Amino acid sequence: LHIVTRESAGIRVIQDLKGKRVSTGAPGSGTEVEALLVLEAAGLSPKDFAKQERLGAQESASALSEGNIDAFFWSGGLPTGSIVELAATLARKGDRIQLVPLPPQSTPVQVFQRRFPGVSAPGVIPKEVYGTRNDTPTLSFWNFFICPASLPEEAAYALTKATFENLEALRQAVPAARNTTLENAVRFVGGAIPYHEG
């Protein structure tokens, strides 16, 4: 999860979003769902903002660059092109991109993981990805194949088998899939989301 801002905005921790103009993601998106849940875990809500926007990553990056918002949430793989472009644009303007940390021991992370076991794990956005001053601790969210329990076992098995037999092709097409491994796939068995028998 990215919480993106610029150094000149003075946002160092999630509580600093109070009184700021913040985009929580496009309406109904995974980003919006995750942002609202993390804010709730931090004891915040969009009512605490000076203004809430509901923009996608590209629109949020443009709004931040133009000074129309102070921060935005984005849930996506590393790197995200619009954030790379934002970092370059801010540098040309004499500012610098900053990511708000969500350390593993912080209240928002601890509360979120207790409420939703098996949905996320502590992660790090390395400073090299966007040219930030430091590595940024965050919550990593996993991609899931979601299907109804009524999906035939053979079909679920065939999807799973095809995915894991073609990981190299998947990783070439989607760089963020580098973390798609059998070990990660079974990491959350018994968590909040039940696994299909297939």
Language model regions located:
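An extracytoplasmic/periplasmic, membrane-proximal ligand-sensing/linker region
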Residues: 76-94, 99-101, 111-114, 142, ...
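Ligand-binding clefts/hinges and TM-proximal coupling segments of bilobed small-molecule sensing domains
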Residues: 28-37, 115-181
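Aromatic-enriched hydrophobic runs in primary sequence
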Residues: 14, 19-21, 36, 65, ...
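Extended aliphatic helical segments
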Residues: 4, 13, 22, 33, ...
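Pocket-lining segment of extracytoplasmic ligand-binding domains
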Residues: 9, 46-151
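Bilobed "Venus flytrap"/periplasmic-binding protein-like clamshell domains
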Residues: 2-66, 168, 182, 188-198
